[in-house]
Amino acid sequence: MYQGKAYAMRQHGFARDQTFELVDQGPNSLTLLLTDSEITHEQYPFAFELRVTYTLTNHSLEIKHGVYNPGSEEILFSLGGHPGFHLDGSLNEYFLDFGGDFKVKQHLITGNFYNGATRDLSLNRRFKLSDELFASDAIVVKSPPFQSIGFGKNDGTRLLTLHCKDWSAVGLWTKPGAPFFCIEPLWGWADSLDSDSTLDCKEGIMRLAPLHKQEFEYSLELH
């Protein structure tokens, strides 16, 4: 709901269903652009430009999202990445490395909404994965106290590390039994069951002034 009008969109927003335009391409990079249109205005009331740049550097893939507000009023938005990685075998054969020991809160979900409940979660350098961890849904940690997550196999093989310095939250997700695992940098998150659905009051919403730009970056380092 924004300024008294209801807007409906799918889970995870509308951008993933749109066609981006290739606006720049170099030897090791490319930039894609999405701008607002009549189609996006049916789901999202603001004018915007969203640029996504992918850059290969040595053994890393850098991903930069640039949001620009070309209009005359503040825009409200959330943004997230959804990198997923193929599993060669069962999820039980893999682990995550958070670079240290952290006590965090997992925010619990009912349907597509946070229900206000949390669960204590201990993260470490050898956090073993299993389908049981994701039986109800994703693990979402708000304001992560770490800036990277390593992904490897229990035999000691290090596969990759996702680096992100300024994420608002991170989601860890798979479908039990599926051949993939996702580490999702987030700047904003789903609504709550007790929300009044007003966009201005949505927890975690990002704000951008007219004619301003904000960038969000993360990288995938291969080992």
Give the residues covered by each predicted segment:
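Extended, loop-rich substrate-binding clefts of extracytoplasmic carbohydrate-active enzymes
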Residues: 5, 9-58
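Active-site/ligand-binding surface loops and adjacent short beta/alpha elements
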Residues: 84-164
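Glycine-rich active-site loops that engage anionic ligands at enzyme catalytic sites
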Residues: 155-191
